[in-house]
C-alpha cells in the first residue's frame, strides 16, 4: 500500500483516488495467458467490461470501505469506476480538516488507509508549469517515404481496411494532438491514401501546437493512419495538465487512461503508445548506485530531484503505480486490444542519451548509466508488444540494420513470460560480447519484440506496426474471426516456428549507444530489434487466419 502525489499547489479543489487491489489477481493472470495462447482452448475468447469487472476490479466490500473512508475524510461526490478498480472523491482545499489524519503535504496518513488500497493518488486541479533542462525534441526526421517502407515490408501501396468495425487508437497527454491541415499536407507529399474523414479525436482535448507531445501526436497519427489505411483512427488526449508533458504527472495520466479505456463498452482493436521514460525501478537503481559511488557528494533526495528536471527521463511515480498500469494493459488485452509501444530511443542505457552538464550529479549518473542497463516503461511490460527501431544501410531497403538508438534489454521489474524462456536462454547462451552479467536482469522480460523504421526514434516505429496490425485485424474481422488482442505469445511462436517468414531478421547493430557495452544484434531474436522487421506475406498468412 503506497501513497503518492503530484505537486501540490494552493488549488481550491482536488481529488483523491483509491486504486483497489484486484479481487482475483491469480485468476486474472491465468485467464490472460490462456486467451493469449494460440494453443489454448480459450484463445481469443475476449471478455466484456462486465466480465472483466469481477476479475480486475476490487470486491464490492473493498469499494464500499474505500468510499466510506474518503467520505470520513470530508470527500464528496464519491464514485466507483465502471471497472470497480478505483474509488474517487472530490475535496475542497479550504475546508476544515482534522489535522491528525493528514500529512503536511495534504495527503491522508498511511496508517488511516483501508487495507484494500493498493495506491492512493492526489489529483490537483492546477499544476505548475514544468521547466526542464534537456531541450525539447526538434521535429523528427521522417526517413524513407511511407511507400518505400511499405515496399520494403511487402505491403501493397493502397492496401486498406474495408471493415467499418476496424478501429485503431493513439494516446498521449499534455499537448498531444494533431492538425488536420498538416495531415492533409503529409498525405499529398507522401502520396498515401489517408482517409481524413476517419481520423478523429475521441476526447474534447485536441492538443496544442508548440508542445513536445504535439509533435509526438502528429507523428503517431500520420504513421498509424498511413499504414492502417482507412481504419477509423481515434486520437485520445485525456489529460492536458503541464505535469503530464514531461514529468511524473505522465504516469498518473497513463494509469487513468488504461483503466478507463478497459472499462468502455467498445474498445479499439489496436492501441499505439509511443510515449514513456525510464521505468521507476531503473530510476531508483540509477540514483541508488550514483549516490553510493559519489561518496557523499550529493544525497539520494538531490539525485531524485535532479532527475525530475530532465525531460521525459523519469515519468512514473513508483513500481506500485507501474503494476497498476500493467493491470490496465492486461485488462485491455483481455478486451481484445493489441497494444504496441515504442522500445525507447536510448539503447539499453538511457531514456534518450547521457545527462548534460559537468556537476557531480550528472557526472555520476553518466558513469552509472553506462555500467548498468536501464530499461524503459511501458513497452517492456509483459502485456504489450514492444517495437524497436531499424534503418537502412546505405539507404538500401534490402539491407535493414538496427537504428542507432533502438531501445532493448531486460526488465528489472517483470520476469520473462513463458513464451520467451527458450529463445532468450539461447540468445544469452550463444552470444559473444554480452554486457557484464551483473549489469542486467537475465530473467527479466526481454524487449523489443519486433521493429520497424525509426528515422529519429521508435515513436515512429510503434504506430507503423500498429497500423500494420490494424490491417491484420481487418482481415480477421472480414473472415469472421475475433481480433488478435495481446499478440506477444503468437508473435514469438510464429517467429520461432517459421523463421524469416513473418519477420525479416536484422543481424547488424548494438544497443550500447554512447557506452562501451550493449547487446549485439544476432541471428534470431535479440534485444536490439527483436525478431526483425515485418514481412506482409508471412504476417497475413500466420496472423490473418485462424485460430
What kind of region is each of these model predictions?
Residues 81-83:
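Short, glycine-/polar-rich solvent-exposed loops and beta-turns at beta-strand/coil boundaries
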Residues 195-197, 235, 340-341, 386-388, ...:
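Acidic/polar loop patches that form or flank catalytic/metal-binding clefts of enzymes
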Residues 352, 382, 386-424:
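Polar, glycine-rich mid-to-C-terminal structural blocks
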Residues 427, 437, 473-527, 547:
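An often Trp-containing, charged/polar helix-loop segment at the C-terminal end
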Residues 460-473:
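Active-site-proximal alpha-helical segments within enzyme catalytic domains
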Amino acid at each position: 500500500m503506497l501513497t503518492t502525489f503530484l505537486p501540490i499547489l494552493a488549488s481550491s479543489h482536488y481529488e483523491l483516488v483509491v486504486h483497489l487491489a484486484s479481487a482475483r489477481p491469480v485468476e486474472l493472470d491465468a485467464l490472460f495467458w490462456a486467451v493469449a495462447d494460440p494453443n489454448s482452448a480459450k484463445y481469443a475468447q475476449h471478455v466484456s467490461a462486465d466480465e472483466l469487472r469481477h476479475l480486475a476490479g476490487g470486491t464490492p466490500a473493498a469499494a464500499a470501505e474505500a468510499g466510506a473512508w474518503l467520505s470520513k475524510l470530508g470527500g464528496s461526490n464519491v464514485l466507483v469506476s465502471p471497472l470497480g478498480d478505483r474509488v474517487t472523491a472530490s475535496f475542497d482545499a479550504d475546508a476544515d480538516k482534522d489535522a491528525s489524519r493528514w500529512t503536511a503535504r495534504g495527503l491522508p496518513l498511511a496508517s488511516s488507509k483501508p487495507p484494500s488500497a493498493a495506491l492512493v493518488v492526489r489529483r490537483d486541479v492546477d499544476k505548475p508549469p514544468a521547466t526542464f533542462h534537456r531541450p525539447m525534441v526538434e521535429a523528427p526526421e521522417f526517413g524513407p517515404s511511407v511507400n518505400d517502407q511499405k515496399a520494403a515490408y511487402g505491403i501493397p501501396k493502397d492496401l486498406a481496411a474495408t471493415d467499418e468495425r476496424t478501429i485503431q487508437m493513439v494516446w498521449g497527454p499534455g499537448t498531444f494532438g494533431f492538425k488536420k491541415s498538416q495531415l492533409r499536407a503529409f498525405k499529398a507529399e507522401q502520396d498515401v491514401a489517408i482517409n481524413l474523414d476517419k481520423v478523429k479525436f475521441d476526447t474534447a482535448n485536441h492538443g496544442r501546437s508548440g508542445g513536445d507531445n504535439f509533435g509526438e501526436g502528429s507523428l503517431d497519427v500520420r504513421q498509424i493512419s498511413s499504414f492502417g489505411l482507412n481504419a477509423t483512427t481515434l486520437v485520445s488526449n485525456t489529460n492536458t495538465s503541464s505535469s503530464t508533458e514531461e514529468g511524473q504527472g505522465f504516469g498518473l495520466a497513463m494509469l487513468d487512461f488504461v483503466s478507463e479505456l478497459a472499462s468502455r463498452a467498445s474498445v479499439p482493436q489496436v492501441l499505439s503508445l509511443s510515449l514513456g521514460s525510464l521505468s521507476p525501478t531503473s530510476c531508483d537503481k540509477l540514483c541508488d548506485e550514483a549516490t553510493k559511488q559519489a561518496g557523499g557528494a550529493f544525497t539520494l533526495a538531490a539525485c531524485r530531484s535532479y532527475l525530475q528536471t530532465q525531460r521525459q527521463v523519469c515519468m512514473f511515480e513508483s513500481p506500485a503505480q507501474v503494476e497498476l498500469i500493467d493491470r490496465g494493459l492486461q485488462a485491455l488485452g483481455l478486451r481484445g486490444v493489441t497494444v504496441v509501444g515504442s522500445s525507447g530511443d536510448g539503447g539499453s542505457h538511457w531514456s534518450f542519451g547521457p545527462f548534460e552538464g559537468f556537476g557531480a550529479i550528472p557526472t555520476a549518473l553518466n558513469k552509472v548509466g553506462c555500467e548498468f542497463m536501464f530499461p524503459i516503461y511501458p513497452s517492456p511490460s509483459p502485456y504489450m508488444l514492444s517495437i524497436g527501431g531499424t534503418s537502412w544501410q546505405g539507404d538500401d531497403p534490402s539491407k535493414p540494420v538496427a537504428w542507432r538508438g533502438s531501445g532493448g534489454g531486460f526488465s528489472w521489474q517483470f520476469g520473462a513470460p513463458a513464451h520467451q524462456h527458450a529463445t532468450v536462454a539461447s540468445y544469452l547462451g550463444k552470444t559473444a560480447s554480452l554486457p557484464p552479467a551483473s549489469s542486467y536482469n537475465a530473467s527479466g522480460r526481454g524487449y523489443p519484440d519486433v521493429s520497424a523504421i525509426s528515422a529519429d526514434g521508435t515513436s515512429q516505429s510503434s504506430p507503423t506496426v500498429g497500423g500494420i496490425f490494424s490491417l491484420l485485424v481487418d482481415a480477421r474481422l472480414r473472415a469472421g474471426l475475433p481480433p488478435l488482442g495481446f499478440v506477444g505469445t503468437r508473435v514469438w511462436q510464429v517467429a520461432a516456428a517459421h523463421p524469416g517468414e513473418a519477420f525479416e531478421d536484422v543481424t547488424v547493430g548494438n544497443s550500447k549507444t554512447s557506452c562501451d557495452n550493449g547487446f549485439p544484434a544476432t541471428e534470431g531474436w535479440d534485444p536490439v530489434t527483436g525478431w526483425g522487421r515485418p514481412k506482409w506475406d508471412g504476417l497475413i498468412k500466420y496472423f490473418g487466419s485462424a485460430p
